[in-house]
Amino acid sequence: MSRIGKLPIKLPQGVTLRGPEEDIVYVKGPKGELSQYIDPAISVTIENDTVTLHRRTNQKRHKALHGLYRVLINNMIIGVSTGFTKSLELVGVGYKASVQGNALDLDLGYSHKIYFVIPPEIKVQAETTKGKNPLVHLEGIDKQLLGQVAAKIKTLRKVEPYKGKGIRYLGEQIRRKAGKTASK
């Protein structure tokens, strides 16, 4: 069996899982509801607040799907019960971030401001402290959507390796390059 796929998933208090109905599993919790398509080769069983996944055959593809869908369902359960957060740090002189409605207003050293529209499923906060780099906090129940939005924001100003200026995840280590040495 798949090492990850064979592990049972414990349902926390207040979280319900139903399905698969027409190959879709629904997870509902205090923070919201999520749904996920499940391949017909994978079966989902729910017993005593424990979810287990089984596969029909031992084909290589089915083994991969077994682990994949177990992790996706586990992420859905964590999302609707506690949620996910990602923080981005804006490193650079004059870099600013503010929230205006459902848009993130960014000043990233370009000649123009950047307005990044945030999906309604994601909550965003901009934090500016004097003497520190501005931070953008993203929060949501869908881990995949949250990561995708954070990655898109990060691509608006990629971190350059010489001075380390740009948008990075909070706590991310950047490989720095040495600049050219002056020749005599």
From Swiss-Prot:
One of its GO terms (cellular component) is cytosolic large ribosomal subunit. The keyword RNA-binding applies. GO terms for biological process: cytoplasmic translation. It comes from Amoebophilus asiaticus (strain 5a2). Keywords: Ribonucleoprotein, Ribosomal protein, RNA-binding, rRNA-binding. Gene3D superfamilies: Ribosomal protein L6, alpha-beta domain (3.90.930.12). GO terms for molecular function: rRNA binding; structural constituent of ribosome. This is Large ribosomal subunit protein uL6. Transmembrane segments: none annotated. Pfam families: Ribosomal_L6. Belongs to the universal ribosomal protein uL6 family. This protein binds to the 23S rRNA, and is important in its secondary structure. It is located near the subunit interface in the base of the L7/L12 stalk, and near the tRNA binding site of the peptidyltransferase center. Part of the 50S ribosomal subunit. InterPro entries: Ribosomal_uL6-like (IPR000702), Ribosomal_uL6-like_a/b-dom_sf (IPR036789), Ribosomal_uL6_a/b-dom (IPR020040), Ribosomal_uL6_bac-type (IPR019906). Disulfide bonds: none annotated. The lineage of its organism: Bacteria, Pseudomonadati, Bacteroidota, Cytophagia, Cytophagales.
